[in-house]
């Protein structure tokens, strides 16, 4: 009996312990901070006192402390790495003056000196070792001085001149919750997670600064001054942004007095504190009475130049507060502040947000609604934004869309709406939904339940925000709007000022609704589209393009087309295609053209069908392309011009390999193409009976098989590309490797290195006839001319011209030299054996660029080419073993048109020019290339997945 009683007591005790451990708890961290701004050195000197209360069932022996200004300390931080991955080198190439840091920390815990240890990976996190363990339900007083050098505003916080955005600025405890510690480095893509507490902050600034901050201002005199002040007129000067290619207009305020003032702000039950200071702010304020009778003070801080868009900003804040209070629950704070601060982009903090107006009043309304809405999602419902960004950004987006539909009847507002009716009729009613559909259609989306830092930059906005908004709409449809609203209001009531996780949200929704929502919530962890009401598609014809209601229509677009070459002259026709978003599996483009000179119908076209066999963006494309134009002509003795036509058909198979890392900008593919080409040749025969010459244009057929393997990384820092290509035709095989590597310069531009190595083989014996027949396929030191474009893949104005300007066109292939020796029967550097070359291109430094004084930029570069080939290594070779050329290059239209002026070159080229071009030599040595076929959207925007 005693044993049974003992077991019973143990069981009851154990049950009690388990219940206690499973009960919700969260830490409380109160902050008292004194800080002084030095607006000459752009520094902060402060002292922080934390009252850390351990409400957990665990004894703590250390506390992780975030020192986030150290994210800007050097180029070896998580912030820097992510910025590079997201396509920005601004911080990476910034100088020490533009960077920031935090130092002079001297922690004491309950009056006892405490040591810190560095985080094993991140410079902006330290481990505070507690002198004495902190048991459950006990508190510790932690204090330290700190010094911050504010960086330029590369991300959310810092300064731009004397405009200050002071965010993530003080030593701050990381969260310890039921899932453990959550130390996290500062990231631009990826927000935060912090404990609730009560804040009292004293800010000392020069007295002519207007300050906006979290919480309620305690200085009555300052409130009066803000309402009565008139900001000074700005004195604009042009300053260059760190790491930027072009100077940006930044306002330099009129110098003010050196006297200071100390402002006191208080706010309970928040998890962060931010403040903003500028002498140029215009300040407006008003009040709003909520249904409960509580009065909220709404204030805006904006700049004079943006006054038109901000004129009704107070009304916008009021609408945001009213709708969110109605749909979710009443706004609990007494103040709400919105700050005009587009320098660092928008970001929300408790009771205050900084944002860009978006360029119009309507877009400002949209952004204010979104950022003020974050007071509910993450400000009050304080989920872990870094791990579960959908719980704040996505839920908030759902309510953005709901507000936009109610206020404007569309979710697009003015962000993408054009003043042109033509454009508006072609823009989608739901742009974000269209982008979600587009990314899921090609299987390059990611699950909604993905950590912020694991999204690529495109998906972070499309998935965490927009796709989650779609998922919330699905949840609303399943529950019905009244029940959905009841669930969300209960979620807010139960979890306000707490840290909900996804499982908490699911449990509550199922409890309130009485539904099993396993299938719906499972969608959060899956790729693919959110189920939408089914729609039948019809075929619709439209002019140019349309993104309107692509879920209902399969579009066929028509647009006028124009073309030109030397033989056909002007060509007019139509462009037919079905390219739109989301991409369809079957795509086509067809452009029939009528040539005004040759009086024949030409054209170009392509059809493809794509399969997506995996779940990581793999793609198998089957395609066929074709083209038919005049590639030459012949004028007979009677003056009749006979065009010589070429026609090609090129079936192909292309496979894009999977990319395991969605954030990677790496692309790999393998492609097989067969070119079936028919060319009209020129044939002279003699009629021996009638003693006349007969000219005919028989068709000649040939083929070429081509295998390519390409690996390309369009990362912003040191992008590269490598291509292996094997061509096989009648009697030969041609192998080539082309590599490109770009070395970035700190202030824009860089050194572009290209290398080529090629080898030519004969199948069977090498004969004079084979040498003659394979001449267009052989390796060239100089960029090949039109007749050497053996697959007709490049655009040439005069493909077979040997005089006038059109004869000076080359293509960037093989050795890539810019000097031409077209008049030689055996061009210098042409070989049917092997060839190696390197090409370097770099911007011309302003110090020696005479055109740098112009008010507009002319993209002049310097090129240098060096190479060798088999013939140079033979006995008694006419050239040295290595040849070179160098000169100036003018690159226009994103390098589509390049003009080359050789100035220095090997002796063999000098001798050629002297012997063949005795006078007016300069312009005849100029070359140019037109590289339309190399246009690649991903080189300009690597994060775009299309």
Each language-model region and where it sits:
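Transmembrane beta-strand segments that form the barrel wall of outer-membrane beta-barrel proteins
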Residues: 554-566, 572-580, 584-596, 618-630, ...
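Hydrophobic alpha-helical and helix-loop surface patches within well-folded domains
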Residues: 3, 28-29, 51, 265, ...
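N-terminal, polar/Ser/Thr-rich
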Residues: 20-45, 160, 519, 531-550, ...
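Glycine/proline-rich low-complexity spacer/linker segments in large multi-domain proteins
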Residues: 75-89, 147-199, 288
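Hydrophobic helix-coil surface modules that form long, contiguous segments used
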Residues: 173-181, 190-369, 398, 443
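Short loop/turn motifs that connect adjacent beta-strands in outer-membrane beta-barrel proteins
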Residues: 548-554, 582-586, 612-620, 658-670, ...
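C-terminal outer-membrane beta-barrel translocator/porin domains of Gram-negative envelope proteins
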Residues: 560-562, 602-604, 618-641, 650-654, ...
């Amino acid at each position: 009996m005693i044993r049974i009683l003992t077991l019973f007591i143990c069981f009851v005790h154990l049950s009690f312990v388990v219940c206690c451990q499973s009960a919700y708890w969260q830490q409380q961290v109160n902050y008292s901070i004194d800080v002084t701004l030095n607006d000459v050195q752009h520094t902060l000197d402060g002292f922080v006192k934390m009252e850390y209360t351990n409400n957990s069932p665990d004894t703590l022996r250390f506390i992780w402390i975030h020192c986030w200004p150290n994210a800007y300390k050097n180029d070896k931080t998580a912030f820097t790495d992510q910025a590079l991955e997201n396509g920005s080198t601004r911080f990476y190439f910034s100088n020490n003056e533009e960077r920031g840091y935090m130092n002079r920390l001297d922690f004491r815990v309950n009056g006892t000196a405490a040591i810190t240890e560095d985080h094993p990976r991140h410079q902006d996190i330290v481990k505070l070792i507690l002198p004495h363990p902190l048991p459950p339900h006990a508190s510790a007083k932690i204090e330290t001085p700190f010094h911050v050098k504010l960086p330029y505003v590369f991300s959310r916080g810092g300064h731009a001149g004397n405009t200050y955005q002071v965010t993530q600025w003080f030593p701050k405890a990381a969260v310890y919750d039921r899932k453990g510690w959550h130390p996290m480095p500062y990231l631009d893509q990826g927000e935060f997670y912090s404990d609730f507490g009560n804040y009292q902050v004293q800010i000392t600034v020069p007295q002519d600064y207007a300050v906006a901050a979290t919480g309620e201002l305690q200085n009555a005199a300052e409130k009066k001054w803000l309402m009565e002040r008139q900001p000074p007129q700005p004195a604009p000067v042009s300053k260059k942004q760190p790491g930027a290619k072009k100077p940006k207009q930044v306002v330099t305020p009129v110098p003010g007095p050196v006297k200071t003032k100390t402002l006191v702000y208080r706010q309970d039950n928040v998890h962060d504190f931010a403040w903003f200071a500028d002498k140029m702010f215009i300040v407006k304020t008003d009040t709003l009475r909520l249904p409960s009778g509580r009065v909220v003070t709404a204030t805006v801080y904006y700049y004079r130049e943006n006054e038109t868009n901000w004129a009704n900003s107070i009304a916008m804040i009021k609408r945001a507060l009213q709708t969110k209070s109605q749909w979710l629950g009443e706004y609990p704070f007494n103040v709400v502040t919105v700050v005009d601060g587009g320098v660092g982009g928008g970001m929300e903090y408790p009771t205050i947000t900084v944002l860009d107006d978006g360029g119009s009043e309507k877009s400002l309304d949209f952004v204010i609604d979104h950022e003020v809405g974050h007071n509910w999602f993450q400000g009050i419902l304080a989920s872990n934004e870094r791990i579960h960004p959908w719980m704040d950004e996505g839920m908030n987006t759902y309510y953005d869309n709901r507000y936009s539909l109610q206020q404007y009847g569309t979710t697009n507002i003015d962000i993408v709406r054009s003043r042109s009716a033509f454009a508006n009729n072609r823009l989608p009613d739901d742009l974000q939904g269209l982008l979600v559909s587009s990314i899921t259609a090609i299987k390059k989306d990611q699950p909604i339940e993905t950590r912020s830092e694991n999204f690529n930059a495109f998906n972070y906005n499309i998935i965490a925000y927009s796709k989650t908004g779609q998922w919330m709409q699905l949840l609303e449809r399943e529950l019905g709007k009244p029940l959905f609203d009841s669930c969300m209001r209960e979620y807010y009531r139960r979890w306000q000022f707490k840290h909900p996780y996804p499982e908490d949200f699911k449990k509550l929704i199922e409890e309130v609704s009485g539904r099993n929502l396993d299938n719906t919530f499972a969608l959060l962890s899956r790729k693919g589209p959110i189920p939408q009401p089914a729609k039948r598609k019809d075929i619709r014809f439209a002019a140019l393009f349309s993104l309107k209601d692509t879920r209902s229509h399969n579009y066929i677009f028509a647009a006028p087309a124009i073309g030109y070459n030397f033989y056909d002259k002007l060509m007019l026709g139509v462009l037919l295609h079905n390219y739109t978003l989301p991409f369809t599996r079957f795509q086509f483009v067809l452009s029939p053209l009528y040539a005004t000179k040759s009086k024949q119908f030409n054209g170009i076209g392509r059809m493809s069908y794509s399969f997506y066999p995996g779940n990581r963006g793999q793609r198998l494309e089957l395609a066929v392309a074709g083209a038919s134009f005049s590639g030459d002509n012949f004028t007979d003795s009677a003056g009749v011009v006979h065009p010589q036509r070429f026609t090609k058909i090129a079936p192909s198979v292309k496979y894009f390999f999977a990319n395991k890392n969605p954030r990677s900008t790496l692309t790999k593919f393998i492609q097989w193409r067969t070119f079936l080409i028919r060319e009209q040749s020129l044939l002279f025969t003699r009629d021996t009976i009638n003693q006349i010459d007969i000219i005919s244009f028989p068709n000649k057929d040939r083929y070429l098989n081509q295998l390519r393997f390409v690996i390309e990384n369009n990362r912003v820092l040191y992008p590269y590309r490598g291509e292996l290509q094997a061509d096989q035709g009648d009697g030969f095989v041609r192998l080539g490797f082309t590599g490109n590597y770009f070395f970035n310069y700190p202030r824009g531009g860089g050194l572009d290195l290209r290398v080529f190595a090629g080898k030519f083989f004969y199948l069977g014996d090498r004969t004079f006839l084979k040498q003659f027949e394979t001449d267009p396929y052989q390796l060239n030191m100089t960029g090949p001319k039109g007749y050497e474009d053996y697959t007709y893949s490049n655009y040439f104005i005069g493909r077979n011209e040997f005089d006038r300007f059109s004869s000076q066109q080359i293509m960037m292939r093989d050795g890539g030299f810019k000097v031409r020796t077209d008049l030689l029967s055996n061009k210098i550097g042409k070989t049917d054996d092997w060839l190696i070359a390197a090409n370097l291109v770099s911007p011309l430094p302003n110090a020696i660029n005479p055109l740098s004084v112009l008010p507009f930029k002319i993209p002049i570069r310097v090129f240098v080419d060096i190479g060798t080939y088999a013939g140079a290594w033979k006995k008694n070779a006419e050239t040295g073993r290595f040849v070179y050329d160098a000169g100036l290059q003018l690159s226009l239209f994103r390098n589509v048109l390049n003009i080359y002026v050789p100035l220095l070159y090997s002796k063999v080229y000098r001798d050629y020019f002297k012997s063949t071009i005795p006078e007016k030599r300069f312009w005849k040595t100029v070359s140019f290339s037109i590289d339309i076929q190399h246009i690649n959207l991903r080189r300009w925007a690597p994060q775009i997945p299309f």
